[in-house]
Amino acid sequence: MHDRRWILDNLDEATRRLKKRDQSHSFEPLVALDKELKAAISTSEAASATLNFVSQSFQPSATPEYRVEAVSRAVQFAASFMPAAPAPTAFDKGAYQAWNRTLKEFSGALVDRRKVVEQEIESYLMRIPNLPQASVPDGEGEADNIEVRRWGTPVEHAFAALEHDALGEKRNILDFEAAARLSGHGFALYRGLGARLERALQAFFLDSHSDKHGYEEVLTPFIVRRECMVGTNQLPKFEEDAYRILPDDLFLIPTAEVSITNIFREQMLEASDLPKKLCGFSPCFRREAGSAGREGRGLTRVHQFQKVELVHLTAPEDSARIHDELVSHAEAMLQALGLAYRVMELCGGDLGFGASKCYDLEVWLPVQKRWREISSCSNFLDFQARRADIRYRPEPGAKPRFVHTLNGSGLAIGRTVMAILEVYQTADERIVVPEVLRRYMGVDVI
């Protein structure tokens, strides 16, 4: 959600930043709606004042001079706003009581219209993406993203390596055929040491973030109310991509970002409560998964996958620093696993709907010979906090402010499995277990 007043008061800057995403974006509809709202408010206030003044003229205590003034005000108001129902030009109690009833109906219609326009403004703002920060690079899409840094040496196998899905099926740790029989295309079934590898990554990520990085671990429900999805900007724009449960109007979460952030929905925090750092594991459910060719194979894009999510709530002045901290925590997982990666700063045209600034971590996949996103770390500023009404008091008695929210994957487990299978496979089609996972796995090789 946006600060409507800030946008209208800083229209040039807001438009310039919005156009970082798409040159076709414009705030002209908002300007028109705001103009209509102001007119409705002004007319409604004038109608109420006229109604009150004329009503007082019916009192026995009203002087002739007061009634003359009431007639004058009524005639002027009707001429400006109710030309089809002109006010009597001379005071007659019966005639003015009849005209007052018409004025009440007109005033009520104005109130109704004001509510409609306010709803239209809210609906419009709900569908406008967050404004990119001024430092976000210009660009139209993925090709315009900027590489910030790399870590590790990308592996190049000297043998005919297998892609992760073929290797997983050969080692009997992934079974896509059984998953399809159960749920259809776009699902994965883990077997034996494959299931243990998933569980080991979950435990390693959570242990690292809670023990080393200071996050509070939470385990939230995986089903949430509609207002939670609105709060973290999945709705209304992406409703068709969500799994909805009828007749309760509940949703399977597409990421633990939704449930963790909304722990604080409609809450008033104190400055001493900030920053909040939470991590949590969850399955993630997304209807939009699946595509032709390699993109639709194996674990690349599925309807259900597991992930450990990192969420921060912070004071506005700290969010830029904490964004860098968040990225470093996700990087630490890849470094511990020995997986080469690069950090990409997303351009305006590639930003997610709610992000004001985002860094993607892309892991190297030697068999596919490409970099693949494994974590997105975003700063939302107060965009989500306004939608979810999450505020804090900078000091006792001070005016409340909206917090800033940030989140990132730490990491997506399915894609981490995919990377491990591609990077750590051997010429005899086995998989070396990364050293940090061996105490969880109980084996060195799969």
What is the predicted function of each stretch?
Residues M1-P154:
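N-terminal alpha-helical targeting/anchoring segments
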Residues A39, V148-I446:
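TRNA-recognition modules of translation machinery and tRNA-sensing kinases, especially anticodon-binding
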